[in-house]
Amino acid sequence: NLVDRMLGSNKLPSLAMTNIHEVLERVASLIEAEAQGSITLVRDYDPSIPDLLIDREQLIQAVLNIVRNALQALSAQSDLRLGRISLRTRTLRQFTIGHTRHRLVVKMEIIDNGPGIPPELQETIFYPMVSGRPDGTGLGLAITQNIISQHQGLIECESHPGHTVFSIFLPLDQGATPS
């Protein structure tokens, strides 16, 4: 089906041990070039996070889709100087993703102070063809969710006017136990 093909291939990720902050820094450099100083980009990283077994390019795409949406939402505001996007990493202990309990996960947060996601869209934003912008394709977050799922991860969103947080959870442990 066409939508499935647009969401990306179903091939397995090309996994390698990768520093998650390298992924976030690549996204940050791309967004800073696009924003041209119109927003503040804040980095709040936990330096103790070990390398993860991930597909670096896929994770860059997943995070870039979220951060680019935040930039576009902030650009729609009248006063661009107040726009702020934060990239934050932390570790969490004993966290369940799906039916699997993980001893340790990395939590990446993309936080912005934009207008928020309308309540009527919040339950469906990860579905294909759902967009909050008239010119949006509605594929970015569906692709992001697909990539995170391929990495046995979880993505969540919490939003209200002035504060939107996308949280990505990726397992750090390879020996998780079903719960």
Q: What are these model-predicted stretches?
A:
Residues 81-95:
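Short beta-strand/loop element within the Bergerat-fold HATPase_c
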Residues 148-149:
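Detector for a conserved hydrophobic position within an alpha-helical segment of the HATPase_c
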Residues 140, 144:
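Short alpha-helical Gxxx[C/S/T] motif in the catalytic ATP-binding
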Residues 40-50, 92:
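Conserved catalytic submotifs in the C-terminal HATPase_c
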Residues 103-105, 117-128:
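Short conserved segment of the HATPase_c
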Residues 11-14, 51-54, 132:
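Conserved micro-motifs of the catalytic ATP-binding
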